[in-house]
Structures are given as C-alpha cells and as structure tokens.
C-alpha cells in the first residue's frame, strides 16, 4: 500500500472532523493514540529486553498521548518514568498525571540523568502542530535524544522536525533520527525523511472520513491498534 500523507492543516482539520462529524471527544482520541503508542513500544522493546521506559512529554496533546502511553505501559509490566516539565493546568492533563501518580509512576525533573538509567525513550514532546524554534526547557532534551544510543520512539513526529520538510537543515535536531515513529491517524509528510521503523495508529477512522482526506486505513491484524508499514529503514 502506497503511503499517503496529511500536511499540518489537513491533519488539524481531520482532528476537528473526528470530534464533530465523528462524535469523538478529545479524551477518546488521546486514549486511542496513547494505546497505539504503547502497543508499538511493546513490539519494539519486549519486557525481557528491558522494562525501564522514559517518556518525555510536551505541554500539548502530544504530551497527553505520552501520559496515556505511560499508563498502559505500566499495566503491561514496564517501569515507566515520566519527564513532564511544563505541566498543563487543563483538567484532562491533570487527570492523566493523577492516574500515573496513583500507579506510583515517578515524574522526574532531570532528563539527562533519567536517560542514564533507562532502556527505551518515548519522544512525546512536539506533534504535527510544531513550528518555529524549540523553547526551554526542551533544547537540552532534543540534544540528548539525538546523541543517545538508546532506542527512541517518536509520537507522530520526531520532536524538532518540521511536519512538512523533516529535520532541520542544521543545528538542533538536524541529526535526530529516532528508532521508530508512530504516525497517529495518518502519516505526515515528514515520513519521507524518516529512516526507521514506522507504525500507524489510527484504528478508529471510518472509511468515509479517510476517503474524504485522501488516505487509506491500513489493515490492522486481530486486536492490534498499530500496524507496521514499510520504510527504507528496518522493518518488522
């Protein structure tokens, strides 16, 4: 199946349509996205290969997806740690954080130190709406992500990448190539610059909505919420 992509404007319009015509709530979409991410990590990082997962969360919806993923990973038997330096005051995000606290999932302030004691990193900092410069406190985090030898799974977009054009030509993030990418709902144009393992998580989009936005819903197997698709990188 040829991969069709959605630009930032189309992706935003699709999200709005899912919450209007599709009758989904933001809570539902975030839960489904985080579940998909957790299933991708489960494939990439089997429990016997290391249970320590560091989830880096940004202040927006991408970070919310990361919080949901961390909860599911905890229930799978992993030991997630969450880096969430810019906590939102929004009730939804506060509830997601409370759910993790109730599961004794630790929140850390020092990302660099946390990297030294983890087995896999989930990059849930910036999503498809990111543009401009990376602001504090995230430049050091992006630098650590591009320097680490650990596997990194990015949620919808490798943080610092332009949604249309991929990694910056120079400077921060220019050499950041995560191990895996989980495209949510549908891949974004940046996937054309990606060279790792690629998963799609969107097992809630109706054929009618997919057709309207010009992409196909991939064939998901069994009860899977993600499907791995071919890239020029490693494939399952």
UniProtKB/Swiss-Prot annotation:
Subcellular location(s): the record lists: Cytoplasm; Mitochondrion
Q: What is its EC number?
A: 5.1.99.6
Segments forming a coiled coil: none
What organism does the record attribute this protein to? Answer: Fusarium vanettenii (strain ATCC MYA-4622 / CBS 123669 / FGSC 9596 / NRRL 45880 / 77-13-4) (Fusarium solani subsp. pisi)
Cofactor annotation: K(+)
| Main enzyme class | isomerase
List the record's Gene Ontology CC terms alphabetically: mitochondrion
What's the protein here called? NAD(P)H-hydrate epimerase
What keywords sit in the KW lines?
Answer: Cytoplasm, Isomerase, Metal-binding, Mitochondrion, NAD, NADP, Nucleotide-binding, Potassium
Q: Name one Pfam family in it.
A: YjeF_N
* Catalytic activity line of the entry: (6R)-NADHX = (6S)-NADHX; (6R)-NADPHX = (6S)-NADPHX
Cofactor comment: Binds 1 potassium ion per subunit.
Keyword hit for NADP: yes
Is-annotated flag, keyword Transit peptide? no
Which sites bind (6S)-NADPHX?
A: 61-65, 127-133, 156
